[in-house]
Amino acid sequence: MPVRRYKPVTSSTRHRVVIDYKSVITKTEPEKSLLAPLKKSGGRNNAGRISVRFRGGGHKRRYRIIDFKRDKDGIPGKITSIEYDPNRTAFIALVTYADGEKRYILAPDEIEVGDVIISGEEAPIRVGNALPLSKIPTGTTIHNIELYPGRGGQLVRSAGTWAQLMAKEGDYAHVRLPSGEIRLINVKCKATIGRVSNLDHENVSSGKAGRTRWLGRRPQVRGTAMNPVDHPHGGGEGKSPIGHPSPLSPWGWKTLGWKTRRGKKPSDKFIVKRRK
């Protein structure tokens, strides 16, 4: 998938690298029946307090209802269009099934308009098809993986990512995730064959602060530039050191390398190898 690099005509185009959407997107208007309103939170929770810092503003969006469950087993569907989704890094594909129903799915890499996909235990091993892990050969590249049967895909959904089915042992399959973690997942859980689309997303550079603001992201202020009341690194005269043996988060936790995962989680028994 090509990217567009701009000539340095202005300071904002000097480092700008964007996805060449015209070479990928086949339809600009979304399917109205698969849209839902999406209200902005500005990073606030139900109490009105900031729960995620540096969020707010951005262009208005409508949510695209995505079929993560892929539960239309045995019914073939034809890829009608590849579309842009402002709510995720990957592209989405509009699928028209043989019974007339339309659904959005995460667009796998190398999928094209006109391709036919199908889900279910008898589906062939082909890019875009969704099967239980028990029916997928070991070594296959997969994405949109369920954690619990029937809940819908929760793992490996962002642009350009993929996982690999390493082995099967009894009721569980060994899956290597993009982080390097090897995890046990029930073989009844479904996964989609192939990689997620938009592999060049990692090469994108906004080029200017304004493009980041369009996405709803506000400037990230350094802790050393704050007052002591706002951050453990704050205060001091001029460019003074942070005043602590190691860097701290705004809430006083050690950061930059300090492991924050809680010990003795119920899911620990499903992790064969920790992430790198």
UniProtKB/Swiss-Prot annotation:
Biased composition (Basic residues): 210-220
PROSITE patterns according to UniProt: RIBOSOMAL_L2 (PS00467)
Top-rank lineage group of the source organism: Bacteria
Positions of the UniProt region annotated as Disordered: 203-276
Molecular functions (GO terms): rRNA binding; structural constituent of ribosome; transferase activity
Gene3D superfamilies noted in UniProt: 2.30.30.30, Nucleic acid-binding proteins, Ribosomal protein L2, domain 3
GO terms for biological process, alphabetical: cytoplasmic translation
Keywords, in A-Z order: Ribonucleoprotein, Ribosomal protein, RNA-binding, rRNA-binding
Keyword presence, Nucleus: no
Composition-biased stretches (Basic and acidic residues): 265-276
InterPro entries recorded: NA-bd_OB-fold, Rib_uL2_dom2, Ribosomal_uL2, Ribosomal_uL2_bac/org-type, Ribosomal_uL2_C, Ribosomal_uL2_CS, Ribosomal_uL2_dom3, Ribosomal_uL2_RNA-bd_dom
NCBIfam families associated with the record: rplB_bact
Function description: One of the primary rRNA binding proteins. Required for association of the 30S and 50S subunits to form the 70S ribosome, for tRNA binding and peptide bond formation. It has been suggested to have peptidyltransferase activity; this is somewhat controversial. Makes several contacts with the 16S rRNA in the 70S ribosome.
Subunit structure: Part of the 50S ribosomal subunit. Forms a bridge to the 30S subunit in the 70S ribosome.
Family: Belongs to the universal ribosomal protein uL2 family.
Name of the protein in its database record: Large ribosomal subunit protein uL2
Protein species of origin: Coprothermobacter proteolyticus (strain ATCC 35245 / DSM 5265 / OCM 4 / BT)
Classification of source organism: Bacteria, Pseudomonadati, Coprothermobacterota, Coprothermobacteria, Coprothermobacterales
